[in-house]
Amino acid sequence: MLKTLSKVSKNLSNTSAFLVKSKPLYISFCTCKAYFEDNTSLSRRFFSAKKSLQFKSLIRKYSEDSTLAWRDYENYNDDDLLYQRELSEIYNKCLKALHPFYPVFEVNSNLYYQLLMFTNYSNPKDNGFSKLLFSQYSDEKKVLVNFVYNVLRLDPDLQRQKRILESIISAALNICVSTVNLSRTDLKSSLKIILQTIDLFKYDSSFSSIYFRKDGPYHKVEKLLKSANIRSSLNSKTFNDFRTLFLLLIRDYSLFHGNSSHCMLANSMLPPSIAFSKMEKAEIFLRLRAFFQLMEHIDNERITPSEQFLDKVFISLLSAKNSCSLKMWLIHSFNKGWPVKIEFFVSFFKNFSNIVEGSMEVYSAYLHIIRDHYNLSDLADVQAIFLSRFILLRKKEDCKKLLEHVLPIRQLFLLNCYSLLNVLANYVVVFKDRLIFQEINQNWEEHKGQIPENFIFSLLKMFGEMQENQGFLNACIYYINKKKNLNEVSRYKINLLLLQGVNSFEVKDFYRKRGIEIMPKNLPRFFCYCLKKNKLSYALKYIRLSGLQFDYIVDCFRNSSDWTRTLISILSKKMGTEFAIRFLKIISFPLLSNDKVLREIEFFAIHEVNFRSLKWVADQQLRILPGWSSRPQKATFPLCTVHLKK
């Protein structure tokens, strides 16, 4: 939508000729502008997007042009379908941006055109009422146009005002009736009051529910119109045109409120040329999430849905996580020969972390659909998504059923299906499947020139879990040779996997040969990384096996005092302050130059109520500041002193 608006703004600023050529698009822009201005909840959501400033600047730039645009439209006598198409397109782009999966309410394209017929007296199919109204009375035109635009802007997120309810409407109708009964009024005054009364309905949240009630507002308005027809000599066509417009609005308000019975009843009272078509009725059932009524309607009416409609059905069922209905629809689509888009499966399972109920059934139905025609790479992506969910939930039986349909490992390497190969490596780690492990082990080296980085780490994790030392070292050497200059995080990952998955003798030998290439540049930060993974023992194992000189290790911690402080804080929290103190003693950390580390230990020791740790902190302070014990009231660590006195 923003691209469309940007295109309009650039063209409008560059040449005035564009305004003549592209009035429909310009009108669409101004209509879209009005849509967002009047719907505060929607504009709030839209303006939170990254490009909100761009849209706001466009709104400001053309805020004064909407009147000019409407004036241009009045003089625009070309095909209204072009205008309708542009308006519909930009409106639906708004909906798509706000509801990426399932727009609950969309004004159907037929409604756009029907409403425009009532606002454009230059149309060849023009009716007598609009021509009479718009050719003579500008005030009435504004009222009706305002009402029409409010219908065009309907959306489920719009929190419509409830300040004008049925009592106010009834009072307005009574005024209207008394005015018409006074024979002194003319046609213009009568129509103006009627239209202003109708305009109040847009504020009434119970509009559709009170419509068919006896002596409800519609019947009062209808009675009023009949009275006006007699007293002001309005012809029957004018009255029928007005009644048709009113029924159109009732129908779509009912649909907006999810009241299908009222919607269909109002629709049945409309002329066949304006009433919903069979396909539009199917759209209504979909919009109301009435899946079984939708299926029944399609079968009874023998409808062949468009590709766009099929897309909407799939997105609706996927976003609702309705696996049972989705399976039925997939099989139904296959039997009818309707196309199925794989992208919906991929996008849905990538965006939803929790697996849907009966997902194996959905996958089986999916395989049933694509058994004769599918893209192997796309199929692997979908299989990877399903398999990863099954692994997450430890559903081994479902994994085995899915693996029956997976291509051979060698073919997956040839097709570069690393999304699925990554998940298969994880499957081996979780379920210790020796057969799949052997197939991956036999094939990866033949295709290692194309292997991505994330798959290398999956291989390393798999080799470590299966205790395949030589395979692990081969993959590690290949990765080091390929990357040459490893970043810090890659060094941490490789060291941790190496210490976890390979026996100490081979690790020590590997460090002796290639250790300098994977050595962490920041040793305290590496310790923090290991602690984050709950693998502190492997960090200590690294110091023992790496062959680093003790003086070098001490210098690393001295030169990275901030990271050392962070490490001591994590150690105190996870392992206790006594462990942190022992660690400081091992590395001979110079507390003389940095009492922030003591602060960290003191803080956690107080929370632990650990007097041994508090005493150690006090002893260190005594050593750092001689004479501190003689002046405890001015101590650097007052909390520590209080706890020791207790």
From Swiss-Prot:
One of its GO terms (biological process) is mitochondrial translational initiation. It comes from the Eukaryota. Disruption phenotype: Decreases mitochondrial respiratory chain complex III assembly. Decreases RNA level of cytochrome b cob1 and may lead to abnormal folding of cob1 protein. Abolishes growth on the non-fermentable carbon source galactose. One of its GO terms (cellular component) is mitochondrion. Keywords: Mitochondrion, Translation regulation. The keyword Mitochondrion applies. It is found in: Mitochondrion. The keyword Mitochondrion applies. One of its GO terms (molecular function) is translation regulator activity. Component of a complex, at least composed of cbp7 and cbp8. Translation factor for cob1/cytochrome b; plays a role in cob1 mRNA stabilization and required for correct folding of the protein. This is Cytochrome b translation regulator cbp8. The lineage of its organism: Eukaryota, Fungi, Dikarya, Ascomycota, Taphrinomycotina.
